[in-house]
Amino acid sequence: EAQLNLIMAQKIESKLKALGANVIMTRTGDTYLSLEGRNVVTRNADPDIFVSVHRNSATSSTAKGYENFYFYPFSIPLAKNVFDSVGATGHLTMRSVKYYPYYVTRVTECPSILTENGFVSTASEYEKLITDASNETLAQATVEGIVKYFNSIQ
Protein backbone atom coordinates (compact mmCIF):
# COMPACT_ATOMS: atom_id res chain seq x y z
CA GLU A 1 0.00 0.00 0.00
CA ALA A 2 2.72 2.49 0.92
CA GLN A 3 4.37 2.20 -2.49
CA LEU A 4 1.05 2.64 -4.33
CA ASN A 5 0.29 5.70 -2.22
CA LEU A 6 3.68 7.22 -2.94
CA ILE A 7 3.31 6.64 -6.68
CA MET A 8 -0.06 8.36 -6.71
CA ALA A 9 1.11 11.20 -4.44
CA GLN A 10 4.08 11.85 -6.73
CA LYS A 11 1.76 12.01 -9.73
CA ILE A 12 -0.43 14.51 -7.88
CA GLU A 13 2.65 16.51 -6.92
CA SER A 14 3.90 16.63 -10.52
CA LYS A 15 0.53 17.70 -11.89
CA LEU A 16 0.04 20.40 -9.27
CA LYS A 17 3.56 21.76 -9.79
CA ALA A 18 2.88 21.90 -13.54
CA LEU A 19 -0.04 24.20 -12.67
CA GLY A 20 2.26 26.42 -10.60
CA ALA A 21 1.43 25.10 -7.14
CA ASN A 22 3.98 24.89 -4.35
CA VAL A 23 3.71 21.29 -3.12
CA ILE A 24 5.28 19.95 0.06
CA MET A 25 5.44 16.17 0.43
CA THR A 26 5.66 14.54 3.86
CA ARG A 27 7.70 11.78 2.25
CA THR A 28 9.37 11.43 -1.12
CA GLY A 29 10.80 7.94 -0.84
CA ASP A 30 10.19 4.55 0.68
CA THR A 31 10.61 5.81 4.23
CA TYR A 32 8.26 5.89 7.19
CA LEU A 33 7.43 9.16 8.89
CA SER A 34 5.48 9.01 12.14
CA LEU A 35 2.14 10.78 12.42
CA GLU A 36 3.75 13.42 14.62
CA GLY A 37 6.57 13.79 12.09
CA ARG A 38 4.01 14.39 9.34
CA ASN A 39 2.35 16.97 11.55
CA VAL A 40 5.66 18.79 12.07
CA VAL A 41 6.33 18.91 8.31
CA THR A 42 2.80 20.15 7.68
CA ARG A 43 2.84 22.84 10.38
CA ASN A 44 6.23 24.12 9.20
CA ALA A 45 4.94 24.36 5.63
CA ASP A 46 1.80 26.29 6.65
CA PRO A 47 -0.13 24.92 3.64
CA ASP A 48 -3.36 26.15 2.11
CA ILE A 49 -4.64 22.55 2.04
CA PHE A 50 -3.50 19.10 3.16
CA VAL A 51 -4.28 15.88 1.25
CA SER A 52 -3.29 12.48 2.66
CA VAL A 53 -3.32 9.71 0.03
CA HIS A 54 -4.17 6.15 1.07
CA ARG A 55 -5.60 2.83 -0.07
CA ASN A 56 -8.21 1.08 2.02
CA SER A 57 -8.40 -2.44 3.44
CA ALA A 58 -11.22 -4.47 4.95
CA THR A 59 -11.92 -7.95 6.26
CA SER A 60 -14.59 -8.34 3.58
CA SER A 61 -13.16 -9.54 0.28
CA THR A 62 -15.87 -7.64 -1.60
CA ALA A 63 -15.36 -4.14 -0.17
CA LYS A 64 -14.54 -1.67 -2.89
CA GLY A 65 -14.58 1.96 -3.82
CA TYR A 66 -13.36 5.45 -3.10
CA GLU A 67 -14.12 7.56 -0.06
CA ASN A 68 -12.56 10.48 1.69
CA PHE A 69 -12.58 11.81 5.22
CA TYR A 70 -12.46 15.21 6.87
CA PHE A 71 -12.48 16.39 10.49
CA TYR A 72 -13.24 20.12 10.49
CA PRO A 73 -16.37 21.38 8.71
CA PHE A 74 -14.23 23.89 6.77
CA SER A 75 -12.67 20.88 5.02
CA ILE A 76 -15.99 19.69 3.56
CA PRO A 77 -15.77 21.76 0.34
CA LEU A 78 -12.32 20.33 -0.42
CA ALA A 79 -13.54 16.80 0.35
CA LYS A 80 -16.63 17.17 -1.84
CA ASN A 81 -14.76 18.68 -4.79
CA VAL A 82 -12.18 15.89 -4.81
CA PHE A 83 -14.88 13.24 -4.27
CA ASP A 84 -16.96 14.57 -7.16
CA SER A 85 -13.96 14.72 -9.49
CA VAL A 86 -12.98 11.13 -8.71
CA GLY A 87 -16.61 10.08 -9.13
CA ALA A 88 -16.81 11.72 -12.55
CA THR A 89 -14.15 9.33 -13.85
CA GLY A 90 -16.35 6.27 -13.29
CA HIS A 91 -13.13 4.51 -12.30
CA LEU A 92 -14.17 3.32 -8.84
CA THR A 93 -17.39 2.69 -6.97
CA MET A 94 -18.08 5.82 -4.99
CA ARG A 95 -18.73 5.40 -1.28
CA SER A 96 -19.04 8.76 0.50
CA VAL A 97 -17.49 11.84 2.05
CA LYS A 98 -17.28 11.15 5.78
CA TYR A 99 -16.41 12.82 9.05
CA TYR A 100 -13.77 10.88 10.99
CA PRO A 101 -11.18 12.08 13.53
CA TYR A 102 -8.07 10.76 11.78
CA TYR A 103 -4.99 12.27 13.40
CA VAL A 104 -3.66 13.91 10.24
CA THR A 105 -6.92 15.72 9.54
CA ARG A 106 -7.57 16.55 13.19
CA VAL A 107 -4.24 18.28 13.90
CA THR A 108 -3.98 20.10 10.58
CA GLU A 109 -5.22 23.67 10.77
CA CYS A 110 -5.99 24.12 7.08
CA PRO A 111 -8.65 22.32 5.00
CA SER A 112 -7.51 18.71 5.05
CA ILE A 113 -8.71 15.37 3.77
CA LEU A 114 -7.63 11.76 3.91
CA THR A 115 -8.43 9.90 0.69
CA GLU A 116 -9.00 6.15 0.46
CA ASN A 117 -8.43 5.27 -3.18
CA GLY A 118 -9.90 1.78 -3.42
CA PHE A 119 -9.49 -1.42 -1.43
CA VAL A 120 -6.23 -3.35 -1.74
CA SER A 121 -7.88 -6.19 0.21
CA THR A 122 -10.29 -6.92 -2.66
CA ALA A 123 -8.52 -8.90 -5.38
CA SER A 124 -10.37 -7.43 -8.36
CA GLU A 125 -9.89 -3.87 -7.15
CA TYR A 126 -6.26 -4.48 -6.21
CA GLU A 127 -5.53 -5.65 -9.76
CA LYS A 128 -6.92 -2.36 -11.04
CA LEU A 129 -5.19 -0.19 -8.42
CA ILE A 130 -1.69 -1.46 -9.18
CA THR A 131 -1.80 -0.26 -12.78
CA ASP A 132 -0.20 2.97 -13.88
CA ALA A 133 -3.43 3.89 -15.68
CA SER A 134 -5.37 3.68 -12.42
CA ASN A 135 -2.87 5.80 -10.52
CA GLU A 136 -2.90 8.31 -13.37
CA THR A 137 -6.71 8.49 -13.41
CA LEU A 138 -6.98 8.90 -9.64
CA ALA A 139 -4.17 11.46 -9.49
CA GLN A 140 -5.65 13.54 -12.31
CA ALA A 141 -9.10 13.47 -10.71
CA THR A 142 -7.64 14.47 -7.34
CA VAL A 143 -5.87 17.42 -8.95
CA GLU A 144 -9.04 18.46 -10.77
CA GLY A 145 -10.92 18.39 -7.47
CA ILE A 146 -8.25 20.50 -5.80
CA VAL A 147 -8.39 23.03 -8.63
CA LYS A 148 -12.20 23.15 -8.42
CA TYR A 149 -11.92 23.73 -4.68
CA PHE A 150 -9.55 26.67 -5.10
CA ASN A 151 -11.69 28.13 -7.88
CA SER A 152 -14.74 27.89 -5.62
CA ILE A 153 -13.18 29.92 -2.81
CA GLN A 154 -11.85 32.79 -4.92
Predicted feature descriptions by range:
Residues 2-154:
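Active-site-proximal helix/loop segments of hydrolytic enzymes
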